[in-house]
């Protein structure tokens, strides 16, 4: 057999970096001379056994590595499922918080409407207007009565003056002499006409009765005025209390609005964090898929290289057997030809060693990538823990908000007890509640659609990973 019939592939080409280690064979080993090349005097069964053990060791290492990689992939899948479950719970809690926020917003709107109604009722109080009108009428009557009293006082003063003058005239008339003083009396009593006593008594009695009636009216007006002032004071006190409660409710509503704004901002931050976490998980999944693709391509190239090496090894083995059989018939004194076959065998060994080193390097690279993915998973776990802590803080703040809502409900009960006219707003509230139910239903449908899309994405990713894992044993 000549050297022209030997097929030399790219795997049989020598490596300039590793050829130097195999150019100096051992001096004590005897070299047989053949037509196509030289080969060492070594048992073929021993070489086959060593080669088989090496192949078995490589196969066992590959299987162990595949098992470890499969276990790592399963662990990553479990971690991704846990992260998806946590994200689902986070979305559920966010929905609950949104519902509670809408409920509290609705309650605050009802309180504002009731406060406006109360203010309008206080401004348009018919009883207060009636009391004011009655007070005006009573004051006018009081002024008229004061004028009548002044007039009666002047009349009584005049009557008293006339009575005194009449008494003086009677006293003078009784003390004067009857005979000689008739002319003086007539002359002195001429400017004063005689007082009719039968008309003065009834007039005085009528004035006394009118005075008593006026006094009774004044006493009645005083009592009514005192009663009105007491009612006015009570109304003013109730008005001040209502104004204070209104101011307190406004302050509480202002604090609740600020708290609601803070909660909305924190909810937006949590949603952005959740979106960032989902994007990170998607990137991690994509990188895992890329690593799997690279690993499969490397394994395919290694399998092809091993097939080429086995074919070359079989060819060299058959050629060595043929040369060994032909060496018995060849003369012993033939000059040693060029050791081409031994060099090809050394090149194959060097190439195999190089492939092993490349395989080891690729394995280390894959291990580093797996460590990087584990570090990313740990960072994802830490970020989920941070999200959980933020969710706990939101729960605490929402508990505080619920306490404020309970206080507001207590204020509502007080306002409801004081003002019963709030029942007229029930129809409007029912209409608003129907609108809110429609909005909640629409929001729930949108959230269900988003969850369905997320589930479809997760199912496709899991199906891709399972397909890759199922193709892996088939390739092995």
Swiss-Prot record:
Polar residues bias locations: 180-190
Record has Cytoplasm as a keyword: yes
UniProt keyword annotations, A-Z: Cytoplasm, Mitochondrion
GO cellular component terms, A-Z: centriole; ciliary transition fiber; cytosol; mitochondrial intermembrane space; synapse
Superkingdom of the source species: Eukaryota
GO biological process: chemical synaptic transmission; cilium assembly; mitochondrial cytochrome c oxidase assembly; mitochondrion organization; non-motile cilium assembly
Record region (Disordered): 1-29, 172-193
Protein name per UniProt: Protein Cep89 homolog
UniProt gene name: Cep89
């Amino acid at each position: 057999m000549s050297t022209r019939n030997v097929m030399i592939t790219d795997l049989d080409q020598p490596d300039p970096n590793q050829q130097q280690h195999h150019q100096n064979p051992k001096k004590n080993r005897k070299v047989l001379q053949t037509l196509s090349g030289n080969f060492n005097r070594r048992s073929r069964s021993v070489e086959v056994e060593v080669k088989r053990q090496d192949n078995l060791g490589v196969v066992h290492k590959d299987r162990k590595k595949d098992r470890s990689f499969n276990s790592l992939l399963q662990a990553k899948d479990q971690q991704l499922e846990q992260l998806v479950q946590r994200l689902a719970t986070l979305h559920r809690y966010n929905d609950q918080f949104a519902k509670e926020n809408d409920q509290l917003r609705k309650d605050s709107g009802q309180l504002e409407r009731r406060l406006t109604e109360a203010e309008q009722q206080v401004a348009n109080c018919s009883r207060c207007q009636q009391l004011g009108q009655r007070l005006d009428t009573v004051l006018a009557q009081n002024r008229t009565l004061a004028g009548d009293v002044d007039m009666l006082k002047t009349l009584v003063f005049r009557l008293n003056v006339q009575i005194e003058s009449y008494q003086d005239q009677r006293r003078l008339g009784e003390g004067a002499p009857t005979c000689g003083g008739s002319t003086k009396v007539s002359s002195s009593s001429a400017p004063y006409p005689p007082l009719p006593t039968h008309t003065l008594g009834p007039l005085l009695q009528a004035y006394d009765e009118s005075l008593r009636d006026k006094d009774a009216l004044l006493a009645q007006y005083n009592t009514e005025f005192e009663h009105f002032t007491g009612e006015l004071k009570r109304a003013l006190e109730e008005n001040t209390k209502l104004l204070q409660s209104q101011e307190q409710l406004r302050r509480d509503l202002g604090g609740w609005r600020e708290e609601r704004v803070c909660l909305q901002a924190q909810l937006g931050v949590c949603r952005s964090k959740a979106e960032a976490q989902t994007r990170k998980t998607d990137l991690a999944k994509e990188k895992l898929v890329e690593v799997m693709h690279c690993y499969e391509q490397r394994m395919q190239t290694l399998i092809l290289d091993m097939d080429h090496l086995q074919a070359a090894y079989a060819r060299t083995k058959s050629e060595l057997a043929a040369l060994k059989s032909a060496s018995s018939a060849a003369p012993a004194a033939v000059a040693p030809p060029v050791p081409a076959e031994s060099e090809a065998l050394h090149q194959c060994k060097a190439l195999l060693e190089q492939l092993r080193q490349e395989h080891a390097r690729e394995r280390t690279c894959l291990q580093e990538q797996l460590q990087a993915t584990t570090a990313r998973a740990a960072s994802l776990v830490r970020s989920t823990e941070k999200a959980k802590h933020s969710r706990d803080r939101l729960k605490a703040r929402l508990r505080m908000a619920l306490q404020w809502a309970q206080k507001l409900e207590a204020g509502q009960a007080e306002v409801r007890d004081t003002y019963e006219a709030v029942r007229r707003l029930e129809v409007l509230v029912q209409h608003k509640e129907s609108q809110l139910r429609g909005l909640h239903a629409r929001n729930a449908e949108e959230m269900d659609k988003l969850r369905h899309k997320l589930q479809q994405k997760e199912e496709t990713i899991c199906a891709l990973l399972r397909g890759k894992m199922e193709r892996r044993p088939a390739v092995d």
